[in-house]
Swiss-Prot record:
Family from the record: Belongs to the diphosphomevalonate decarboxylase family.
EC number of this enzyme: 4.1.1.33
Pathway: Isoprenoid biosynthesis; isopentenyl diphosphate biosynthesis via mevalonate pathway; isopentenyl diphosphate from (R)-mevalonate: step 3/3
Protein's job: Diphosphomevalonate decarboxylase; part of the second module of ergosterol biosynthesis pathway that includes the middle steps of the pathway. MVD1 converts diphosphomevalonate into isopentenyl diphosphate. The second module is carried out in the vacuole and involves the formation of farnesyl diphosphate, which is also an important intermediate in the biosynthesis of ubiquinone, dolichol, heme and prenylated proteins. Activity by the mevalonate kinase ERG12 first converts mevalonate into 5-phosphomevalonate.
Name of the featured protein: Diphosphomevalonate decarboxylase
UniProt-listed NCBIfam families: mevDPdecarb (TIGR01240)
Length: 362
């Protein structure tokens, strides 16, 4: 049996991907930017094994046997096998591309709870099989394969600050992830995640995207005017380590994304009352100067970015209301508990996929 294990990170978009121009290839209607979070707190661990004794491809996720028959997963496996077959010409090279695969995967966070589990999952799957197959392709090339599994997964193939360039080619060959800056560029950036709900969301992302593209009038303006300008401005803010500008663009883009969801017909609600309270709290924190930035993906959970220098200022107010829930690494004075948050995750910026000796197969 041949085996390889990899951990892959969660990434949280600061410039949102929402809308596909090609559903089967997962080609986006706009470019996006994300921050890769530390795998100490959020990661998917995947072990990929190949053996002549395996009768069929199988996947276990968090201990449960899952189907591999989805078109997205099949596209990833086919691309990876094709790349492996191209380096198997020598009679001495094991024909791994012809063997069935067993893939075992575990998250250390709730799956499908708005914490980008599919992104980490497909990034781990592609990275583990690429490692198993000893593929020579770089991460940008592999990101095109991960993209077919889950659009935002392509961004989890890099650490630090990442751009997914939408590309223009119909076959998607130029729709890939690239590094804007490594995690060492801005190591003092921190994130705190407020888990508002561990439940699966009412409107899955793919369904929501299709509805928005088909029915929202605001959407066309967002992808044609708003995002292209913001994309360049946000890259500059990251490279300049300009937190107030980065924060403003991040919050505005979160608002813009949820505005097109609301403008969809029927409207899509991802934020709930707790989410809105958190937005108000961040506005309170930022009254004197901008030191915190909220962003919400397709769900009610909040991610708040801040610089380590302002940690006490940012976390003390959040702790005041949410100090009673688990997950805190630092402690302040808790006064007025606000219901609606089940736990918090304090984290930082992290690297891309990492090879590990930890194996999920015996």
């Amino acid at each position: 049996m041949y085996s390889a294990s990899v951990t892959a990170p969660v990434n949280i978009a600061t410039l949102k991907y929402w809308g596909k121009r090609d559903k089967s290839l997962n080609l986006p209607t706009n470019s996006s930017i994300s921050v890769t979070l530390s795998q100490d707190d959020l990661r998917t661990l995947t072990t990929a094994s190949a053996s002549e004794s395996f009768e069929k491809d199988q996947l276990w996720l968090n201990g449960k046997l899952e189907s591999l028959d989805t078109p997205r997963t099949q596209a990833c496996l086919a691309d990876l096998r094709k790349l492996r077959a191209s380096i198997e010409q020598s009679p001495d090279t094991p024909k791994l591309s012809q063997m069935k695969l067993h893939i075992v995967s575990e998250n250390n966070f709730p799956t499908a709870a708005g914490l980008a589990s599919s992104a980490a999952g497909f990034a781990a799957l592609v990275s583990a099989i690429a490692k198993l197959y000893e593929l020579p392709q770089d991460m940008s090339e592999l990101s095109k394969i991960a993209r077919k599994g889950s659009g935002s997964a392509c961004r989890s193939l890099f650490g630090g600050f990442v751009a997914w360039e939408m590309g223009t080619l119909p076959d998607g060959q130029d729709s890939k992830a690239v590094e804007i800056a490594p995690l060492e560029h801005w190591p003092s950036l921190r994130a705190v995640i407020l888990v508002v709900s561990d439940d699966k969301k009412d409107t899955p992302s793919t369904t929501g995207m299709q509805s928005t593209v088909a029915t929202s009038d605001l959407f066309a303006h967002r992808i044609a005017e708003v995002v292209p300008q913001r994309f360049e401005a946000m890259k500059k803010a990251i490279l300049d380590k300009d937190f107030p500008k980065f924060a403003e663009l991040t919050m505005k883009d979160s608002n813009s994304f949820h505005a097109v969801c609301l403008d969809s017909y029927p409207p899509i609600f991802y934020l709930n009352d707790t989410s809105k309270k958190i937005i108000k709290m961040v506005e309170t924190i930022n009254q004197q100067e901008v030191v915190a930035a909220y962003t919400f993906d397709a769900g009610p959970n909040a991610v708040i970015y801040y610089d380590e220098a302002n940690q006490d200022k940012v976390l003390s107010l959040l702790y005041k209301h949410f100090g009673h829930v688990p997950g805190w690494k630092t402690h302040y004075t808790a006064e007025t508990p606000v219901a609606g948050v089940s736990r918090i995750i304090q984290t930082s910026i992290g690297p891309g996929p990492q090879e590990t000796s930890e194996s999920l197969t015996k």
